[in-house]
Amino acid sequence: MSCTPCRPQKRLTRPRSQVPRVQTLATEVKKGGVEVLAAVPLSEETEFKVELFVKPVIGNTTAAQDGREPTPHYWSISSAIHDKESGSSIKVEETPDADTTVCYSLAEIAPPDIPNQVSECDMKVWELYRMETELLVVPLVNALGNTNGVVHGLAGTQLYFWAVGGQPLDVVGVTPTDKYKGPTTYTINPPGDPRTLHVYNSNTPKAKVTSERYSVESWAPDPSRNDNCRYFGRVVGGAATPPVVSYGNNSTIPLLDENGIGILCLQGRLYITCADMLGTANSRIHTPMARFFRLHFRQRRVKNPFTMNVLYKQVFNRPTETVDAQVGVTEVTMVEEIGPLPPSIQTTLPTSVNLTQLPRTVTLQSQTPLLNTQQNSK
């Protein structure tokens, strides 16, 4: 009996698993209400640096005269905090004097104009991408004096705050306690009942720091806004906490977000807001002499939010002169079609010329008002 040879079995091969292709979607990054594009390469023409000192601001108790608001006090030491009735420096006031209140300092920078800034598709704007800031301070020893052989020093509540943005800083109006109302002169106090403003709610007022009249005890930065802004603040409490201030010119603060985009100067302006308190001594608030800023700008391309039609209407199609003209004018519609003319204007045209040889636009003069021939020519 012969054996049939076994057929070789085919080796089963599993199909190779194909790596799924990841579909890349177009990323659209918006900031400040515009679509942000690539940055312009750095060069001498596309980079800009500015340095400035911002002075501290203390309120002014002078009332408004002739409709003019009082100017702020650029002091580093406030007036003495005391009670108006007893003169004691212990009782806390519900309406303190304005010259004992620290307000936000405000500065505005206008970068230079960019040549060939706008094209049909995009436009170039200045972008703040890094900065350096520090306080101008000195130790206070002999300047504070001594009592009973003990040298005084600064202590108490401290505040360190700065903000840079393409628009003024957005703030919310709050009160430290349910009885605090703020100064009666100079400062802009949050409208509303202090009993409801000492805790955030849906009726909390909002504003923008457009002047140096906003107190640091009544207005706080709004974390739900300030999209095109970067701010930093630190509050140190305690009745006897001494200030610890570090300063130097070897630290750089990057201002780029998670998409690598800095502060866009879409309106051609950069707004700087700051407020600092070192503590109190002899019932007076002490602040630094100034805060120093060194700002570095570069150019960034953004998508042009204006179409040519909008630019034409806003720039070219705007009357240069304002006139007081008649409003009851009768409008007459003329059509450029060959047809019989009304009898009232037949005598004004030459009879020896063919109507087809006339120009497309003809000025007709008549002793009587012209009639609308649009419906008759159809």
Curated annotation (Swiss-Prot):
<keyword id="KW-1160">Virus entry into host cell</keyword>
<keyword id="KW-1015">Disulfide bond</keyword>
<keyword id="KW-1145">T=7 icosahedral capsid protein</keyword>
<keyword id="KW-0426">Late protein</keyword>
<dbReference type="GO" id="GO:0042025">
    <property type="term" value="C:host cell nucleus"/>
</dbReference>
<dbReference type="GO" id="GO:0005198">
    <property type="term" value="F:structural molecule activity"/>
</dbReference>
<keyword id="KW-0167">Capsid protein</keyword>
<feature type="region of interest" description="Disordered">
    <location>
        <begin position="1"/>
        <end position="21"/>
    </location>
</feature>
<comment type="function">
    <text>Forms an icosahedral capsid with a T=7 symmetry and a 40 nm diameter. The capsid is composed of 72 pentamers linked to each other by disulfide bonds and associated with VP2 or VP3 proteins. Interacts with sialic acids on the cell surface to provide virion attachment to target cell. Once attached, the virion is internalized by endocytosis and traffics to the endoplasmic reticulum. Inside the endoplasmic reticulum, the protein folding machinery isomerizes VP1 interpentamer disulfide bonds, thereby triggering initial uncoating.</text>
</comment>
<dbReference type="GO" id="GO:0019062">
    <property type="term" value="P:virion attachment to host cell"/>
</dbReference>
<dbReference type="InterPro" id="IPR036931">
    <property type="entry name" value="Polyomavir_VP1_sf"/>
</dbReference>
<comment type="subunit">
    <text>Homomultimer. The virus capsid is composed of 72 icosahedral units, each one composed of five disulfide-linked copies of VP1. Interacts with minor capsid proteins VP2 and VP3.</text>
</comment>
<keyword id="KW-1164">Virus endocytosis by host</keyword>
<comment type="similarity">
    <text>Belongs to the polyomaviruses coat protein VP1 family.</text>
</comment>
<keyword id="KW-0945">Host-virus interaction</keyword>
<dbReference type="GO" id="GO:0075509">
    <property type="term" value="P:endocytosis involved in viral entry into host cell"/>
</dbReference>
<keyword id="KW-0946">Virion</keyword>
<keyword id="KW-1162">Viral penetration into host cytoplasm</keyword>
<keyword id="KW-1048">Host nucleus</keyword>
<keyword id="KW-1161">Viral attachment to host cell</keyword>
<dbReference type="GO" id="GO:0039620">
    <property type="term" value="C:T=7 icosahedral viral capsid"/>
</dbReference>
<dbReference type="InterPro" id="IPR011222">
    <property type="entry name" value="dsDNA_vir_gr_I_capsid"/>
</dbReference>
<dbReference type="InterPro" id="IPR000662">
    <property type="entry name" value="Capsid_VP1_Polyomavir"/>
</dbReference>
<protein>
    <recommendedName>
        <fullName>Major capsid protein VP1</fullName>
    </recommendedName>
</protein>
<dbReference type="Pfam" id="PF00718">
    <property type="entry name" value="Polyoma_coat"/>
</dbReference>
